[in-house]
Amino acid sequence: MKTKLNELLEFPCSFTYKVMGLAEPELVNQVVEVVQRHAPGDYSPQVKPSSKGNYHSVSITINATHIEQVETLYEELGNLELVRVVL
């Protein structure tokens, strides 16, 4: 994945992912599980429901150590079945 993030970020740094997906109970656990694989830590993601309650947005901040870690997490979070968008 070619991005300009590498030019914009200085590692290590805090990096927040906003994951939007279906409002299913397992969404948050799946997001944390993927993040734990690449950036182990103690996470307390923030969850906000959509106005109609069909979707949830999950915000989770990691301590990113390199651009490959950031890009891999974008890809793996986007591949989760419940996820619709990763910002």
Curated annotation (Swiss-Prot):
Top-level taxon in the UniProt lineage = Bacteria
Q: Which GO terms describe its cellular component?
A: cytosol
Which Gene3D superfamilies did the record assign?
3.30.70.260
Identify the Pfam families for this entry. Answer: DUF493
From the UniProt annotation, give the residues forming the signal peptide: none
Q: Which InterPro entries match?
A: UPF0250_YbeD-like, YbeD-like_sf
UniProt lists the family membership as follows: Belongs to the UPF0250 family.
Q: Tell me the NCBIfam families matching this sequence.
A: PRK04998.1
Q: PANTHER family annotated for this entry?
A: UPF0250 PROTEIN YBED
Q: What is this protein called?
A: UPF0250 protein plu1293
- Tell me the organism: Photorhabdus laumondii subsp. laumondii (strain DSM 15139 / CIP 105565 / TT01) (Photorhabdus luminescens subsp. laumondii)
